[in-house]
Amino acid sequence: MLPTYRPNKRRRAKSIGFRARMETPGGKKVLSARRAKGRKNLIAK
């Protein structure tokens, strides 16, 4: 059986990166919520 998690920087950035978040209304909500909370990092590394 193959491992379920295969890390890939590009794929990760495309799905949960800053630019990906800015593309959708929901993503913008996520960013604004994290700004409101005072998060040091708006996106997960």
From Swiss-Prot:
InterPro entries: Ribosomal_bL34. GO terms for molecular function: structural constituent of ribosome. Residues 31-45 have a biased composition (Basic residues). Residues 23-45 are annotated as: Disordered. GO terms for biological process: translation. GO terms for cellular component: ribonucleoprotein complex; ribosome. Gene3D superfamilies: 1.10.287.3980. Keywords: Ribonucleoprotein, Ribosomal protein. Belongs to the bacterial ribosomal protein bL34 family. NCBIfam families: rpmH_bact. This is Large ribosomal subunit protein bL34. The gene is rpmH.
